[in-house]
Amino acid sequence: MTSHPNQSPALTSYFSRLERRQGVSKPRAFVASAEGAALCSWGDTTLPLALGGVTRFFTLAMVLREVDRGALTLETPVADILSPHHIAGLCVVGGVDHSNSITIGHLLSHRSGIADYFSPPHKRVNTLRDQILRSDRSWSVEQALEIARHYPGAFIPGTARHVNFSRTNYLLLGEVLTKSTGMSFDALVDLRIISPLGLKRTYVFTRDYYDRYFSLAPVTNGATPLHIPQALASFGADGALISSAADTVAFLRGFWNGALCDKSWLETITAHPLRSSTAPPLSVGVMIAPLPGTSTGLGAQADPTGIAAGINIQTGVCAMVSTHRVGTLQGAMKDLVALMAIV
């Protein structure tokens, strides 16, 4: 086990438990106060990691910035931004296409009803998730949307008392950002997040970076390392960000401090979370989890590859933890909550 003599016994015990898990060898974590003081550092916090679903936090920040500047609202119909061929047929319920009623807010909060292109709910389907666990492959946004159209909408957009977690939502938000700004997703991340915050180890993984894949912290499925550069580049606004633990926490602090979008959004994006059968409770753009023994909660994003990052809604303490092992969204969130409860 990695030696960290300055960490508390509780933190040492926490990381020891992570390292004893099958397939986990070098977990990484970084925690900082809202002011930037390091509260916990474990492993190499400068090593680049594939953030997976934590990318959605970055996408959220850029969408909220578009709302701040008046280009969008949460009530803006997606059909007002994207062309009909993007939208048509994405949420058909009872034979009626409700896709034109999907709003920006519905996409952010997973209340669009659109099926998850990556891991649709039907059994006996050879999903993209199953495929990339066996061998690498790529896909386009258009192909992902076509997969989603094969499945009925989970509900009429905005009407259900629960959410339907769907990676398709954030692929669409990436397309919305490209349309509303006239910039590619990777260029926008550089302009709106990387440059203002001075992040040195953060970038969007595209086909231009295939040769960098082996520089990333390895992710394992059981005992098998995943080699999926094509898939990683295909995730786009839903999962293609590369960053280090330290850079990710710097991003979260920027979000908390209002450097990326108006700070008043924190209350909106963490209010009234709704349950999900396949993910932790979701609000507008973040997963919500209570912190044991406190009256506050955690606004976070996570990925089944064992990575999660979030903000203590009350104190602004920001954290990221990664085990680099394929598991579940809920499992990654539990690891983050357990870490935040200690610090």
Range-by-range predicted roles:
Residues 1-15, 20, 106-139:
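Extended low-complexity intrinsically disordered regions
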Residues 1-41, 46-50, 80, 178, ...:
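Catalytic loop of the DD-peptidase/beta-lactamase superfamily, centered on the K-T-G motif
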Residues 9, 57-61, 76, 102-105, ...:
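A structural signal for well-ordered alpha-helical segments within the folded catalytic domains
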Residues 15, 50-78, 173-178, 248, ...:
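Active-site SXXK
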Residues 24-26, 69, 73-75, 160:
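Short secondary-structure junction motifs
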Residues 28-29, 38-41, 48, 92-96, ...:
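Catalytic-site signature segments of enzymes, centered on catalytic residues
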Residues 53, 82, 167:
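Ligand-binding clamshell of periplasmic/extracellular solute-binding protein-like
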Residues 68-119, 150-151, 175, 179-223, ...:
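Active-site helix/loop module of the DD-peptidase/beta-lactamase fold
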